[in-house]
Amino acid sequence: MNSERKTATILEDPKINIKIKLSGLWVANMFLFIYVDYFGLYIPGVMEKIIEGEVAHTGIQISQVFLLAGITLMMIPSLMIFLSLTLPAKANRWTNIIVGILQIVVLVSALIGESWAYYIFATIVEVVLLLLIVWYAWKWPKQEA
């Protein structure tokens, strides 16, 4: 008879620092942001409009102002990846809450009139990620003074 005992292995579940959680959520958000725009290039007629100097289905002309606004919008999650890791706790918390809420407003407003399922689905996921950012920042761990 085999008398060997098997011991259960319990996996360690290390606590993840709030700054790393927030930065990771911003990374995921930024990738979705980029991929939504990238896949939008596959929509019939979009490339032709870009070649003509126009944003498809909007009537907006592609100009320096448009591109500056676009890169500024894209820069926000890029900078938040770094800022979430480096800002002091109080500034970090409020920056993530405020920027997260502002990004939600931008994304939801971009949904107006949208009919492509991929865009709607990705935006919902982005909003969920941003809500997690706001939630984690709001619930920032406290320590005794």
Language model: regions and residue ranges:
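Cytosolic juxtamembrane helix and N-cap/initiation of the first transmembrane helix
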Residues: 2-33
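Hydrophobic alpha-helical transmembrane segments
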Residues: 11-21, 42-45, 64-76
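Hydrophobic transmembrane helix segments
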Residues: 29-64
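Juxtamembrane helix-break-helix junctions at the cytosolic face
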Residues: 74-94
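Hydrophobic, membrane-inserted alpha-helices
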Residues: 76-81, 102-108
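Membrane-helix boundary connector in multi-pass membrane proteins
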Residues: 92, 105-122
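Hydrophobic alpha-helical segments of small multi-pass membrane proteins
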Residues: 96-107, 122-133
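Membrane-water interface at the C-terminal end of transmembrane alpha helices
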Residues: 128-145
